[in-house]
Amino acid sequence: KVKTIIDKAPVITEKMLRSEATSNMYDKKGNVIWSQTDIRRNYIKYDKLPDLYVKLLLNTEDDTFFQDRGVSIKGLANAILSRGRRGGSSIEQQLIKNVAFSSDVKDRTIDRKVKEFWLALQLDTNWNKKQILEWYVNKITMGEGSFGANTVAITYYGTSLDKMSERTPENI
């Protein structure tokens, strides 16, 4: 059964992971099935992310990010016990969720969690951690049509993330 589920998982490409002015949702063959362009996004490279921001983000979202292989076993167990309705996903799983799956609660199933798990392993195998984290911070939505950490910093604080003081990132 697991192989059948994995076989139905979408193929993740670098194009899907890279942030663009448009957010797209893709089918398993890599075809765009949904697109949204009325968003704000200002891309920031990994080497421009303040160290404090990275530490705070990982402490909050995935404290084993640089040690794990793309998945959180604890998070997966948590999701299975809650029938796929609870979080605990790794950074890789969250990134996969943002680029490949619907955010609709009714779509959160054990099958989808298995696909996320598999795709997160593939992500971790095919790309390095810094690249994955760069894509992640540029894909996340923080409200008000703002996508990515840099856009959030500009929207809420009036300055880009790499120009913020060390006191400010903890408020993001």
Set out the residue ranges of the language-model regions.
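Juxtamembrane regions of bacterial inner-membrane/periplasmic proteins
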Residues: 1-172
